[in-house]
Amino acid sequence: MSTATASEPKVAPTRKRSKVKTILLTLVGLFVAFVGVVLAVASTKPATFRVERSTVVNAPPERITPHLNDLKKWTTWSPWEKLDPDMKREYSGAESGVGAKYAWDGDSNIGAGQIEIEEATNEKVAFSLEFLRPMACKNAADFTMTPEANGTKLTWSMHGENTFMGKVVQVFLDMDDMCGPQFDEGLSNLKNLAKKSN
């Protein structure tokens, strides 16, 4: 006596398509919600930013400014130099001081950009800073030197406008946390160089 085996029920193709569609719509909805949250948070970011660090150097400003005015000397103290020793460097304009220019092109660690000194005194060295990649932007930066009892207070600051994309980036990356430690390292290197030139 033969027994009939019940065949397994087949899922209708339309039901499968319905499940896939539901999953896709859910993922799209989550993505849209995520983007909405990011844009909402980005809109609360300030219109400008400023990163600043200071140290006291046991030396007068006259022994600090030569390391700032001559862009070729930045290789001796800049914290970014060691990140890509093979980066391309190009110097133009004045030999030092106002009008001196320095362009770099490196790997993903430092990107590409250029610097031009716009003010150079024993109290302040200011320069424009243009990044070409990984994200194009223009900022201003300066070193100020203030006499103190124990030497010179050296302050390094960078400031600029927060573009829309800049605000979005700052949802995930804090400018102060990202640049502050490198400013501290650069100031420490300058401090040691000024001591050696004593």
What are these regions (language model features)?
Residues 192-198:
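Generic C-terminal helix-cap and adjacent flexible tail
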Residues 57, 61, 67, 110, ...:
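Solvent-exposed, acidic/flexible segments
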Residues 122-125:
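Short, conserved beta-turn/loop elements at beta-strand boundaries and strand-helix junctions
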Residues 63-74, 102, 117, 127, ...:
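Hydrophobic pocket/interface hotspot
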Residues 10-90, 94:
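Hydrophobic ligand-binding cavity/cleft-lining segments
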Residues 52-54, 112-114, 138-142:
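Well-ordered beta-strand positions in beta-sheet-rich domains
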Residues 3-4, 11-22, 48, 118, ...:
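Beta-strand/loop substructures that line and gate deep hydrophobic ligand-binding cavities in soluble
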Residues 69-119, 167-169:
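Extracytoplasmic/periplasmic/luminal assembly and interaction segments
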